[in-house]
């Protein structure tokens, strides 16, 4: 659910989840279940166009902080991007430290790794998908 719609309903996220749990299609599936833990946070819907610069001197940005999430309503993908970008950041850090160059140019291997894998390839390929899925035309079918 997009933030403006949530705000217009004047309901907290946990109230909406409670309503969902009472829905006739859901309630029988979770009858007798116990909530062990609850958490919620805003998921970035920025996509490829809003992705920040991924490196600077002594710095690499990964996961949600780098808008590496494909989020469009019921479709959400991001844990795989966070894990992979973290791994590639670690590899690039080792490489930069070994070379003695931890400035942006020394960390360029990070972006190269991302570009050569599903992380940035998927973001580039699907960069228009969130706009389509979240469009008024699709949301009001």
Predicted features along the sequence, with ranges:
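Aromatic-enriched hydrophobic runs in primary sequence
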Residues: 1, 6-9, 37-38, 45-47, ...
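Conserved FAD/dinucleotide-binding core of flavoprotein oxidoreductases
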Residues: 1-42, 77-80, 95-99, 111
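Alpha-helix capping and helix-loop boundary segments enriched in small/acidic/polar residues
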Residues: 7, 50-53, 73-81, 101, ...
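Generic alpha-helical propensity signal that fires on short helical segments
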Residues: 14-17, 77-83, 120, 128, ...
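FAD-binding beta-loop-beta segment adjacent to the flavin cofactor pocket
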Residues: 41-73, 138-139
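A conserved active-site cap/scaffold subdomain adjacent to cofactor or substrate pockets
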Residues: 53, 62, 66-97
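Active-site-proximal substrate-binding core of FAD-dependent oxidoreductases
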Residues: 69, 87-140
